[in-house]
């Protein structure tokens, strides 16, 4: 068993002796009976050197959106009335209703005992004061259009078919818990 973080020079190839995984750097392939890809569908597809038509058709039907997360202490992004603050606070831009933002009030959500309120805001539509920013993180989330939702039922068709197993939040609603749930389900297929 080997656990590896995805690198830019990583690929998986099928061979007569099983799966070969190239980790880059020293031009060396490692041989495995099975490989688990616990990552986004698009990243999993990019890691497979020569995906089957079925793998390509299924994994390419999941889209992802870039997101900006800002960890901060700026209360000005929250509603003026503190009585309506909740763990999850959703905001919509009045001028452009397709723009929305979500702020997690981490003190309530994570039961933090800090003196200061701490927030995690995704894709802010209001400016967050620079001096109150703790960290900025860019990442991607699954984007659920009808194509992705319809395609979720097909994921079982590629599970362990080429000795490659898949898990990730795209098996569910995009939450961390969905990634965990999909890994538990994936393990049931490990010895098929």
Predicted features and spans:
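Single conserved hydrophobic/aromatic residue that forms the stacking wall/gate
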Residues: 1-12
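Short secondary-structure boundary/capping segments
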Residues: 2, 61-62, 155-157
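Mid-domain catalytic core of redox enzymes
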Residues: 13-142
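Conserved flavin/dinucleotide-binding core of flavoenzymes
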Residues: 99-192
